[in-house]
């Protein structure tokens, strides 16, 4: 059945994880129709795994590519297709009652990550310890003038880390300047999830299915040196490994489960208040409550 391609098993969950956390972690890949977290009725805590059902099979596949063996609350999680069974009373909703299967896969959850996330240096210093002043001189800075509804909301200024990810930074810079004949001007932030991220960059289809890079095709993940350590970080959206185009997102909070899956290539240096205005137009399912447009964009020279 098609449902089996849309439902994911997620194992290795920390005690702190609930349906809201899972929704925030998996919603970037597509619309979610259901989340189930089976409970241990003796302890009244969840059993360390959950099931996430997507509207579309391709979205579920993208979630597996991005989230399997990623980190969530300090633990490495396991994500794969679930094995559903149907409720006998005529319902089409799967029920996760195959305990032998659950024991088999929930037993394979990986150990808690040994490295403390809190030991990371602040993003302004970065992992390489390069002074901020030197980075500001050597790396390009770009801007986006944002319009919410029909009113100007302000400017977001971003530093692009060409010293760490030159290919990714150059792609974004050129899409801001339109020097290749196409780019972000006039496009929208099509997916906005409060306390998570604001995603844009689809200037062809305007719905998250399009966009293109300056290289004429999807390009590879350059590296994962920079991390999703807090709000205001600029990172590439993708549909799996090595599928970078033009879509990007700005973080509204720490999103460390995306580390190693999405390439961070810049940070907001001015206009975090504008990002918060964009964030306020979001919703749990990612659909903006109000149109958010990149009215103009370019490079500081």
From Swiss-Prot:
Record-listed Phosphoserine modification sites: 91, 97, 119
Segments of this protein annotated with the region Disordered: 107-140
GO molecular function, a single term: mRNA binding
GO terms classed as biological process: mRNA splicing, via spliceosome; protein folding
InterPro entries assigned: Cyclophilin-like_dom_sf, Cyclophilin-type_PPIase_CS, Cyclophilin-type_PPIase_dom, Nucleotide-bd_a/b_plait_sf, PPIE, PPIE_RRM, RBD_domain_sf, RRM_dom
EC number: 5.2.1.8
RRM domain span: 5-83
UniProt subcellular location: Nucleus
Domain PPIase cyclophilin-type stretches: 143-299
Enzyme class, UniProt record, top EC level: isomerase
This protein's UniProt keywords: Isomerase, mRNA processing, mRNA splicing, Nucleus, Phosphoprotein, RNA-binding, Rotamase, Spliceosome
Function: Involved in pre-mRNA splicing as component of the spliceosome. Combines RNA-binding and PPIase activities. Binds mRNA and has a preference for single-stranded RNA molecules with poly-A and poly-U stretches, suggesting it binds to the poly(A)-region in the 3'-UTR of mRNA molecules. Catalyzes the cis-trans isomerization of proline imidic peptide bonds in proteins. Inhibits KMT2A activity; this requires proline isomerase activity.
Self-association state and partner proteins as the record states: Identified in the spliceosome C complex. Component of the XAB2 complex, a multimeric protein complex composed of XAB2, PRPF19, AQR, ZNF830, ISY1, and PPIE. Identified in a pentameric intron-binding (IB) complex composed of AQR, XAB2, ISY1, ZNF830 and PPIE that is incorporated into the spliceosome as a preassembled complex. The IB complex does not contain PRPF19. Interacts (via RNA-binding domain) with KMT2A (via the third PHD-type zinc-finger).
Entry's family note: Belongs to the cyclophilin-type PPIase family. PPIase E subfamily.
Domain notes: The RRM domain mediates both interaction with RNA and with KMT2A (via the third PHD-type zinc-finger), but has much higher affinity for the KMT2A PHD-type zinc-finger.
PANTHER family the record matches: PEPTIDYL-PROLYL CIS-TRANS ISOMERASE, PEPTIDYL-PROLYL CIS-TRANS ISOMERASE D-RELATED
Protein name (record): Peptidyl-prolyl cis-trans isomerase E
Species assigned in the record: Pongo abelii
Gene designation: PPIE
């Amino acid at each position: 059945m098609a449902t089996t391609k849309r439902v994911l098993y997620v194992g290795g969950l920390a005690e702190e994880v609930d349906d809201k956390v899972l929704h925030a972690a998996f919603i970037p890949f597509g619309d979610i129709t259901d989340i189930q977290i089976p409970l241990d009725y003796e302890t009244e805590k969840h059993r360390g795994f959950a099931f996430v059902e997507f509207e579309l099979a391709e979205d579920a596949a993208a979630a597996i590519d991005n989230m399997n063996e990623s980190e969530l609350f300090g633990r490495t999680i396991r994500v794969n297709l679930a094995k559903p069974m149907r409720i006998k009373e005529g319902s089409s909703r799967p029920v996760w009652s195959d305990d032998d299967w659950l024991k088999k896969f929930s037993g394979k959850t990986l150990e808690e990550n040994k490295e403390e996330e809190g030991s990371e240096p602040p993003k302004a210093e970065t992992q390489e310890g390069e002074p901020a002043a030197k980075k500001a001189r050597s790396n390009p800075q770009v801007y986006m003038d944002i319009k919410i509804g029909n009113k100007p909301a302000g400017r977001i200024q971003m530093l692009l880390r060409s010293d760490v990810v030159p290919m990714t930074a150059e792609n974004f810079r050129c899409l801001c300047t339109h020097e290749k004949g196409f780019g972000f001007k006039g496009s929208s932030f099509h997916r906005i999830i409060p306390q998570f991220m604001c995603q844009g960059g689809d200037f062809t289809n305007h719905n998250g299915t399009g966009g293109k890079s300056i290289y004429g095709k999807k390009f590879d993940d350059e590296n994962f040196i920079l991390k999703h350590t807090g709000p205001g970080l600029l990172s590439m959206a993708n549909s799996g490994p090595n599928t970078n185009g033009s879509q990007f997102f700005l973080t509204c909070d720490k999103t460390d489960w995306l580390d190693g899956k999405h390439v961070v290539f810049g940070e907001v240096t001015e206009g975090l208040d504008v990002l918060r205005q964009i964030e306020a137009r979001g919703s749990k399912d990612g659909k903006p409550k109000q149109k958010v447009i990149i009215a103009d964009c370019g490079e500081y020279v």
